[in-house]
Amino acid sequence: MSSNNGDVRLWGGRFADGPADALARLSASVHFDWRLAPYDIAGSRAHARVLNRAGLLTEDELTRMLAGLDRWPPMWRTLLHRTIADEDVHTALERGLLERLGAELGGKLRAGRSRNDQVATLFRMYLRTTPGSSGLIAELQDALVGLAEAHPEVAMPGRTHLQHAQPVLFAHHVLAHVQALSRDAERLRQWDARTAVSPYGSGALAGSSLGLDPEAVAADLGFEGGSAGNSIDGTASRDFVAEFAFITAMAGINLSRLAEEIIIWNTKEFSFVTLHDAFSTGSSIMPQKKNPDIAELARGKSGRLIGNLTGLLATLKALPLAYNRDLQEDKEPVFDSCDQLEVLLPAFTGMVATLTVHRERMEELAPAGFSLATDIAEWLVRQGVPFRVAHDVAGACVKECESAGIELHQLTDEQFAAISEHLTPEVRSVLTVRGALASRDGRGGTAPSAVAVQLAEVKADLAVQHAWAARES
């Protein structure tokens, strides 16, 4: 029934037997929490130092302990995979330390810390430093900014409900996606500030009676916010994990929205863009196919990221304070989200950076679908016509065009006059795409002058983002 192959367990004494093989298999997490190993080593070094300051390790013991810990980094992967009998990464690493230092010295490292505060701390450390999501997002934004800068005057049909709405600059549209990604990066920075609090010293839930200094550990491990102010919350809270999962899911959603547009733009019917051969795939049976697989995988992976978030929230929703073993299930979804973004973002960036934009096709469709109707209404308002009347008059112009099978700029002066006495020949000044674009020069608008301001602001924000990402790495 039971299994005990000489492996180290961090609990025992009151147990006469066990654990059963079935329980050991269920409990094992070393196959995924191995990625916390470098942070476990760093945490153990910091813990050894506070044990020394508290008089629980002599100077000689501290020196030997740190020397033993120094030997871990080159061999921790081999150590972790030597046996699956270890319950988790922390057990595996402690086993290795005991083997090298002996039970008398190696066994002292466990004093004053529980896996509860240990895991909560290491998980924060991992998420704060890997996989460099902010830097990868910034690289995608750089590619989008480059796309906008390469096509500053290209007009395209702006859409609502996927129907022609008003002409906009292609650069304006692209920068809208950059803005959304900037908020994702900003969320990461804000999340990091909230997560920069160390649970070390919280123990299992009630804190420590050994005179250890949690503030020293927090400083040693780079937690700018110091140590947790409540030991129960320090060990039991996983809102930082849920928030990180939301940020990754939101980033995935923002990628998916852009991906959907690229897929549509790449169709024969739209022909707005062409994908580079290096960032598209073919068909096993149809030789003419050139498929937008990266964009499609971005859509698919966004669902996966959302699933990781919702699964995590379902795990957390009914946990009483403090720690519960359910929290072992908090890591795999977020590890997966990190991995998915790490592989998706570089490919997506390459796809964007190598897009060929077809200006002629975009500008051909920019005025189509009566997209200048709003300009007629606003021109009338500037002539003193109440907007509701102006709206009706512009709608009547569209109706006339639909009946005649023409576009708004093709209406004659006589037809305009027949629709409304307010429609003088001067209305033609707004019936050009360039005129419509130039008129929307308020902050955030699509006029070239307004888009230039947006571009400058985005680039300034990107400089901040790159600096923060460099600190992150």
From Swiss-Prot:
Q: Does the keyword Transmembrane helix apply?
A: no
**Name of this chain's protein:** Argininosuccinate lyase
Please name the top-level EC class of this enzyme.
lyase
| Principal cellular location given in the protein's record | cytoplasm
- Could you name the domain of life of the organism this protein comes from? Bacteria
Metabolic or biological pathway: Amino-acid biosynthesis; L-arginine biosynthesis; L-arginine from L-ornithine and carbamoyl phosphate: step 3/3
Q: Which residues cross the membrane?
A: none
Does this entry carry the keyword Transport? no
Q: Name one GO cellular component term.
A: cytosol
Q: Which reaction does it catalyse?
A: 2-(N(omega)-L-arginino)succinate = fumarate + L-arginine
Name the InterPro entries for this protein.
Arg_succ_lyase_C, Argininosuccinate_lyase, Fumarase/histidase_N, Fumarate_lyase_CS, Fumarate_lyase_fam, Fumarate_lyase_N, L-Aspartase-like
Which HAMAP family does the record match to this protein? Arg_succ_lyase
Its GO biological process terms? arginine biosynthetic process via ornithine; L-arginine biosynthetic process
Family the UniProt entry places it in: Belongs to the lyase 1 family. Argininosuccinate lyase subfamily.
Q: Which GO terms describe its molecular function?
A: argininosuccinate lyase activity
Say which species the protein is native to: Streptomyces clavuligerus
Q: What is its EC number?
A: 4.3.2.1
Question: Which locations, inside or outside the cell, does it occupy?
Answer: Cytoplasm
Keyword vocabulary terms for this entry: Amino-acid biosynthesis, Arginine biosynthesis, Cytoplasm, Lyase
The record's listing under Pfam families reads: ASL_C2, Lyase_1
